[in-house]
């Protein structure tokens, strides 16, 4: 039948300064990111398959929303603080961890929609990194890592 799907309750989101990760955040309401490899097939007339793949520049962009508790998250944007982000999800016995050792927060919007909780909506871009947080001693130009534990 396959493995059980990951759920929204068995995981952590950590955010810290570049090169470090803080403790798990408990104020995140949503997180989304997209990794684009920018590969392009080299197709030609008369062939049913591509002869090669052209490699483009990879990019990773995302958004994160969190409850407004204080100015900490907004200050990461205002002060242009390079940050590190780690997202772990699990199903009880397996964990999948996405690590971005160097991100730049591009916006921090706080709407005031009434008397309910205020939400900070932030966009970010992953940047190439050369710190030890990257998890590799040989690859010093990476923006994104995925690790798994369990099966």
Feature-to-residue mapping (PLM):
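Signature of extracytoplasmic/envelope-associated structural regions
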Residues: 1-151
């Amino acid at each position: 039948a396959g493995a059980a799907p990951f759920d929204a309750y068995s995981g952590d989101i950590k955010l810290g300064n570049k090169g470090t990760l803080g403790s798990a955040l408990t104020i995140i309401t949503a997180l989304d990111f997209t990794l684009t490899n920018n590969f392009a097939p080299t197709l030609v007339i008369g062939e049913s398959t591509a002869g090669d793949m052209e490699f483009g520049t990879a990019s990773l962009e995302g958004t994160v929303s969190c409850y407004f508790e204080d100015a900490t998250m907004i200050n990461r944007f205002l002060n242009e603080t390079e940050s590190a982000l780690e997202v772990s999800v699990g199903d009880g016995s397996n964990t999948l961890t996405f690590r971005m050792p160097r991100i730049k927060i591009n916006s921090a919007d706080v709407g005031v929609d009434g008397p309910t909780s205020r939400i900070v909506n932030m966009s970010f871009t992953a940047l190439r990194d050369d710190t030890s947080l990257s998890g590799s001693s040989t690859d010093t130009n990476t923006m994104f890592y995925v690790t798994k534990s369990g099966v």
